[in-house]
Regions:
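Periplasmic c-type cytochrome electron-transfer domains
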Residues: 1-401
């Protein structure tokens, strides 16, 4: 009965408060990135994020797949870079709060994540020597880099720094990289890591602001009936009640960003038979070997603060076929859904969770919900109340002028 749905119990009000954007703590420092909160670095990162020159064909920027007007995603089931990317591009909004990056958690910082696509043949298709040369050839970039990180090394000498070289699975790039002197490789990788650190300083500012849901929760916490009635209709109240109750959604989608930042197997059928389908089981192995991880030589962190990496679970059946829980904020802008964009609408998503099919890989953690059609509609209507503005500096939320 909708009229009674207005009276939330003390326990329910506690849950609502925990999901409210007002409960989002200030961002903690990223010890692995000493320029994470440097305004000059964020400004440089903003330019780099939208710059298409940092790609093999000069046509792909970070913003190609993370478009501000599409909730910093791309509206496609699978991302499209220089080739077809086997994953759905997730939003960047609020990811600064996450300890893991990519759907399989194969990176452990925002800055190391930013480096992955740049050298992926199907994404930016670049190489780190090429990127350092672009930086050096642009007086504005050279100057900004110098102010933030110290003088940008000159990498124009092709005998020392081949135009296309990187430690990646592309034979020519790999051979050119292997032929370089160790000291020169370190110079290039240091500049490359700093490119990532500047981009991360920018991405840290992309934080969600209050949605209609947050206004409703605030009204509930203040006991303001009139505002509650104005902001949420009976369907939305019913959907919220299901979300925190028998829908079981908050088991994974909890906290003010509506994600536990963990990895779960939900039994989605993969699009193709690919090794990446094992998800977190492969991601954790990757991140432990990554030269740009928290413990690596390019990280600014003391080893003692790299607890997430050191103590992460590395094996177990629950990692197989598990992918990262995404935030539910701004869902209205970020369709299609899931790690391979398998579900194109929110109604398809709630129906999928209602059915909870058996997993083809590993074991699904879901149990059928047995919600009625009306309940599913209500749940979907509630999920549409989670869109809100971004609270970062507005000039940085669109391409540089």
């Amino acid at each position: 009965e909708p009229s009674q749905a207005q009276t939330w119990t003390a326990e329910e009000r506690g849950i609502l408060r925990s999901l409210w954007i007002g409960s989002l703590p200030p961002l903690t420092a990223d010890p692995s990135n000493r320029v994470a909160d440097n305004a000059k670095a964020a400004k440089l990162g903003h330019k780099l994020f939208f710059d298409k020159r940092f790609s093999g064909n000069k046509e792909i920027a970070c913003s190609s797949c993370h478009q501000p007007e599409k909730g910093f995603a791309d509206g496609l089931p699978l991302a499209q870079g220089m080739g077809a990317v086997p994953r759905h591009a997730p939003t960047i909004i609020g990811t600064a709060y996450s300890p893991w990056f990519f759907w399989d958690g194969r990176k452990d910082s925002q800055w190391s994540q930013a480096l992955g696509p740049m050298e992926s043949p199907v994404e930016h298709g670049g190489t780190r020597t090429q990127l350092t040369k672009i930086l050096f050839s642009d007086p504005d970039y050279s100057k900004s880099y110098g102010e933030i990180f110290g003088t940008l090394p000159d990498t124009t000498d092709e005998s020392r720094f081949p135009n296309i070289a990187a430690p990646i699975d592309v034979p020519l790039s790999r051979a050119a990289w292997d032929a370089m002197k160790t000291a020169d490789r370190k110079i290039v990788s240091r500049i490359y890591s700093n490119i990532g650190k500047a981009i991360a300083a920018y991405e840290r500012l992309i934080i969600p602001g209050p949605s209609r849901f947050d206004g409703y929760v605030e009204a509930v916490l203040n006991g303001d009936q009139a505002v509650q009635k104005r902001l949420f209709n009976d369907d939305e109240i019913g959907g919220l009640s299901l979300f925190i109750g028998k829908g079981n959604c908050t088991q994974c989608h909890n906290g003010p960003l509506l994600t536990n930042n963990d990895f779960h197997n939900t039994g989605l059928t993969p699009r193709t038979d690919a090794p990446g389908n094992v998800g977190r089981a492969a991601g954790i192995k990757s991140v432990r070997k990554d030269e740009f991880n928290c413990l690596g030589q390019f990280s600014d962190a003391e080893d003692a603060v790299c607890g997430e990496l050191k103590f992460a679970k590395v094996s177990g059946i629950e990692l197989i076929g598990s992918f990262k829980t995404p935030t539910l904020r701004n869902l209205g802008k970020t369709a299609p859904y899931m790690h391979e964009g398998q579900l194109s609408t929110l109604s398809a998503v709630v129906e999928f969770y209602n059915r909870a099919p058996k997993a083809k890989i590993g074991h699904s953690e879901l149990k059928p919900l047995r919600l009625t059609k009306t309940e599913l509609v209500r749940l979907e209507r509630f999920l549409m109340t989670l869109d809100g503005p971004l609270i970062g500096p507005q000039a940085l939320m669109s391409p540089p002028r």
